[in-house]
């Protein structure tokens, strides 16, 4: 029963697209209108609404992935197969939100949040950020999905 509650919490939090709503409510900016990908994500919040909206969106997107996983990790058995669903729920909620008629984002920031909730120690977080920045700015990998797969793969091998 507790697993179900954490899965539901994660999916509902994931379905709340902070990177879409923060720019829209505070800056009257629809971040999905101008960019060609029409993605309601943090990168578009930064580009369309500015630094403050982007940073606030990033923090909220990270927390919505981290909070349910962190809390569940303290209460539930991490070794259970159901714990994988707890971790996946915020990501699926973001990718297929019922609040937005299933028009979600790529779930990159919320995936980072899930990892932060699972590994709250500082080293893994810096490692993940380093890989993502490396493949975003230095050795640019496109598309975003390929960059994310490589980042998460290297993260898994090195942490």
Positions of the model-derived regions?
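Short, non-helical or kinked segments that cap or interrupt transmembrane helices
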Residues: 31-39, 99-112, 143-154
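Interfacial segments of multi-pass membrane proteins
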Residues: 49, 72-75, 89, 93, ...
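C-terminal ends of transmembrane helices
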Residues: 19-24, 91-102, 134-145
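Cytosolic, membrane-interface loops and tails of multi-pass inner-membrane proteins
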Residues: 21-52, 104
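Multi-pass membrane catalytic core of lipid/isoprenoid biosynthesis enzymes
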Residues: 41, 47-73
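Helix-coil boundary and interhelical linker segments in multi-pass alpha-helical membrane proteins
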Residues: 1-9, 67-85, 116-126
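N-terminal signal-anchor transmembrane alpha helix
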Residues: 2-27
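Transmembrane helix boundary and interhelical junction motifs in multipass membrane proteins
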Residues: 15-21, 103-111, 126
């Amino acid at each position: 029963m507790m697993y179900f509650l954490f899965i539901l919490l994660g999916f509902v939090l994931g379905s709340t697209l902070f990177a879409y709503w923060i720019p829209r409510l505070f800056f009257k900016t629809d971040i999905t209108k101008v960019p060609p990908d029409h993605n309601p994500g943090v990168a578009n919040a930064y580009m369309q609404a500015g630094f403050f909206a982007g940073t606030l969106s990033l923090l909220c997107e990270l927390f919505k992935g981290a909070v349910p996983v962190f809390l569940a990790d303290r209460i539930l058995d991490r070794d259970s197969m159901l714990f994988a669903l707890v971790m996946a729920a915020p990501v699926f909620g973001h990718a297929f939100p019922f609040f937005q008629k299933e028009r979600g984002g790529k779930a990159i920031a919320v995936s980072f949040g899930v990892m932060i909730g699972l590994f709250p120690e500082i080293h893994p977080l810096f490692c993940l950020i380093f890989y993502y920045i490396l493949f975003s700015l230095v050795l640019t990998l496109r598309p975003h999905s390929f960059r994310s797969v490589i980042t998460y793969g290297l993260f898994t091998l090195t942490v």
